[in-house]
Amino acid sequence: MSASIIAIDAMGGDFGPHCIVPACISALAEFPSLHLALVGQAPLIEEQLARQSGVDRSRLQVHHASEVIAMDERPAQALRGKPDASMRVALELVRQRQAHACVSAGNTGALMALSRYVLKTLPGIDRPAMVSPIPTERGHCYLLDLGANVDCSAEHLYQFAIMGAVAAETLGVARPRVALLNVGTEDIKGNQQVKLAASLLLQARGLNFIGYIEGDGVYRGEADVVVCDGFVGNILLKASEGLAKMITGRVETLFNEGLFAQAVGALAMPLLRRLKADLAPARHNGASFLGLQGIVVKSHGAAGQESFQSAIRCALREVQENLPQRLHGRLEDLLL
């Protein structure tokens, strides 16, 4: 494969083809070398394609899959009971090297289970971890895990830290600062798993481990890679998104209270738009599953067109950076 081909689970998420197909058409327009394989119920996909103008069908394929994994479906049921689900067929395209990556807005637990089953993990990795950039005062940091692994051992946190550091390096961060999210920065703080993980990371050669970080330190940009279990990470991510929406919403409301406030708001509108763009979850949508023998990107289930397009951008960048192969090479040095 010379061109970058991304398999899209067109049935995933809250909106399915109605949102995903237009996002794919926009992505094709944005990246002239991109090819997409839309996987799902072909009649529904074709119906949405017919509503789009300027579709380049030479860079777009439709793969029919008769089954859909529901957002509330148990991972075990998805794994055993739906061999022709759109999510699974999209992952199979990656395994068969007919696509370089898979993007899905579907059921997170099912996507993780199927990804591990179909693509397998890299040597030395027990569990893949979900990672995504989140905005900070200094730009962004990479946070993992974001919900794929609710219960983690110290060894899992250690592996997440190694994978996060290597991914950050691959994506352009020189000697990334790695920290464990904790309730304090002192050595005595934290539960047993976090303390054990810290002791392991202190012994890791070639890793720039800076110790513990608190929640406010994440947003000050005190670390480039922040590691926690999926329970904590998912709560932090969702709270961040909610807080960003509340702040921008409150500012807009204040600028509409009275003539003077409206005048000030009109002058400040360019800055407000910039702030909203910087904090918008759509801009940062796309969580990578690190540790697999292939590229899988999870989009937010409630993602709209712009947001899903961001997830496609994330997958394309990882394809261009050859992330799994580079990750495998560095993990051999650090873990094996």
Curated annotation (Swiss-Prot):
InterPro entries: FA_synthesis, Phospholipid_synth_PlsX-like. GO terms for molecular function: phosphate:acyl-[acyl carrier protein] acyltransferase activity. One of its GO terms (cellular component) is cytoplasm. Keywords: Cytoplasm, Lipid biosynthesis, Lipid metabolism, Phospholipid biosynthesis, Phospholipid metabolism, Transferase. Its EC number is 2.3.1.274. Transmembrane segments: none annotated. Pathway: Lipid metabolism; phospholipid metabolism. It catalyses: a fatty acyl-[ACP] + phosphate = an acyl phosphate + holo-[ACP]. SUPFAM superfamilies: Isocitrate/Isopropylmalate dehydrogenase-like. It is found in: Cytoplasm. Pfam families: FA_synthesis (PF02504). Its main location: cytoplasm. One of its GO terms (biological process) is phospholipid biosynthetic process. Homodimer. Probably interacts with PlsY. PANTHER family: FATTY ACID/PHOSPHOLIPID SYNTHESIS PROTEIN PLSX (PTHR30100), PHOSPHATE ACYLTRANSFERASE (PTHR30100:SF1). Belongs to the PlsX family. Catalyzes the reversible formation of acyl-phosphate (acyl-PO(4)) from acyl-[acyl-carrier-protein] (acyl-ACP). This enzyme utilizes acyl-ACP as fatty acyl donor, but not acyl-CoA. This is Phosphate acyltransferase.
